């Protein structure tokens, strides 16, 4: 059997064994995709014992390409929400998550200096303790750039594997301790979160208002400031028994019923100006109007603003809402359409069909992947990661590397959405498939390279002390920030659990947090809020630590 065939066969065996290990769960918690690392260690041990030689160049390529696929698809997935998460609404959560990352780096630096832990080993312990695989890849990349011998770089994978198991268990232990210390009632916390959402600014709601302000009688909608804004959409108007789709030039009269869409505060302000909220239904049932959701798939409208498409003037159709990446938004006239946007249309059936044809509404396109943008994005990401950043006093130039470059580029492209006929939308199923393939390939190779010496290191070497160092790196930041967030910021327990899981970019921990309450989405929401920024910082941190330690050494 050729070297290539043998290498592929062994990798396939690693994936099978590792995924099987990952599916084993104790009390609903397992290693998940991280099981592939341990599958690689097991197979790597026996491959080494048997004296089998695999293709080193091929393993190196597969490891790097797998990492690129993984971080790129993560960036495309979270890109649309990344920059929004940095705004004020998620600022507090992100600050606490950043504090966890910084404290983890400080603990790592202190351990490195006190116990004289070799640089590759301490970086591997750091990556495993925070359960972040891209950090492992970024650390190995910068060590190679610094001229570290290959056998020492491979030690990073071994120390990562030592620290990884407690990294997963440690976050779950922290959640349990927070619940025990503060005697948390999970049901009460879920109800508090729901009530805070209802009073917040994040939910799009509707309100039916009767026009009672005499100053508005016989005025056009466009002349009423609160209605002629990007915060409120008037999608229906009922006069006597007639329901119509209003346009900016529609004249409103006293007694008209307006169906408004917007955020709660804006709707309340509109009600104070216009009149009184009523319970009267403005349903399209029994009328010649209907409400329908269509999806944007036509490349010709991508990037165009809603106002420039003139749907109301041409088709007598109003867009009442816009759903982007699962987030409901007010369909402001300045909003630009992106591939995969879901539009809520109000109008007559024939008119809605006409608008649907304009925007595409081809459901099958949502299941197709444009491969050209994928490779353009990966290529640009690799180029970005290769740009040297020279910092005075540092022995080598800093680089985003093969982990950071594709991630940053994917975040930018995911936020842009489309350029001309190229769109970076990727169906969730395709994104997940590429992401899982990438991380399986990466972890399989890391495990194989670590497996030969793993048992000896654990039983006769420094393995147990590495595990101990990892426990400090995992627990000190989590417990400290958890206490600060709960005591001083009065953070909701479920939100806190999601933030802690997100700060470690740990899907098994998120699964555990979600299972704390069957219906609350608090943990998932906070996890998604901090995940993009934390993922970026987790990739940059080992590179900074490596360069700083190298310069000090």
Curated annotation (Swiss-Prot):
Matching SUPFAM superfamilies: TrkA C-terminal domain-like
Gene Ontology CC annotations of this record = plasma membrane
Q: Which GO terms describe its biological process?
A: potassium ion transport
Major location category of this protein = membrane
Query: What keyword terms does UniProt attach to this protein?
Result: Cell membrane, Membrane, Repeat, Transmembrane, Transmembrane helix, Transport
Q: How does it sit in the membrane?
A: Multi-pass membrane protein
Location of the protein in the cell: Cell membrane
GO function term, MF aspect, one: monoatomic cation transmembrane transporter activity
Q: Which Pfam families match?
A: Asp-Al_Ex, TrkA_C
Membrane-spanning ranges: 4-24, 28-48, 65-85, 95-115, 158-178, 371-391, 393-413, 437-457, 464-484, 493-513, 533-553
PANTHER family membership: K(+)_H(+) ANTIPORTER SUBUNIT KHTT (PTHR30445), TRANSPORT PROTEIN YIDE-RELATED (PTHR30445:SF3)
Q: Which HAMAP family match?
A: YidE
Say which family it is in.
Belongs to the AAE transporter (TC 2.A.81) family. YidE subfamily.
Q: What is this protein called?
A: Putative transport protein YidE
